[in-house]
């Protein structure tokens, strides 16, 4: 990651924020998340990257500020959107809201969200009662019925896909 960052890949800072946080360095985690996502959130209000970073790694007050910012953006009739919003909601411990945001913002790049959703960090989201409906609305059920489900996903007795 450091090599990627030194070669100019700015969002490597976001990935480095996870490591800093795991090492207990909250201040560095906040700075790296903010630096690594700022360019990905350029259509959000100024300072959004820092507010969201503080919410992810900071205290309850910082988390509530970040959630309020995201709520304000998503409440707009045509949100100034970024794929970082669903990922941020997942990181803020709001998986149900993250799923909802993905469905509300279908035309944005949510690849970062989906990478995290299918990792161990997406376990809470995959366990939600609304997850099967999310899969249906995303068109995944139709594809999985045709081509087979991914590893760790199976149909339950009700016919819904359940993913570990």
Residue ranges of model-derived segments:
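Alpha-helical protein-protein interaction modules
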Residues: 1-164
């Amino acid at each position: 990651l450091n090599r990627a960052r030194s070669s100019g890949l700015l969002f490597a800072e976001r990935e480095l924020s996870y490591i800093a946080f795991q090492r207990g360095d909250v201040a560095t985690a906040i700075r790296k998340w903010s630096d690594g996502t700022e360019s990905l959130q350029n259509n959000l209000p100024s300072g959004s990257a820092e507010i969201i970073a503080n919410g992810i790694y900071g205290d309850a007050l910082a988390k509530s500020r970040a959630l309020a910012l995201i709520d304000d953006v998503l409440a707009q009739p045509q949100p100034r959107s970024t794929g970082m919003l669903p990922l941020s909601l997942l990181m803020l411990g709001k998986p149900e809201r993250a799923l909802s945001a993905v469905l509300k913002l279908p035309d944005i790049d949510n690849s970062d969200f989906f990478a995290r959703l299918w990792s161990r960090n997406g376990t809470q989201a995959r366990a939600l009662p609304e997850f099967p409906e999310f899969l249906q609305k995303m068109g995944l059920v139709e594809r999985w019925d045709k081509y087979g489900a991914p590893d760790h996903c199976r149909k339950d007795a009700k016919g819904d896909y359940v993913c570990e």
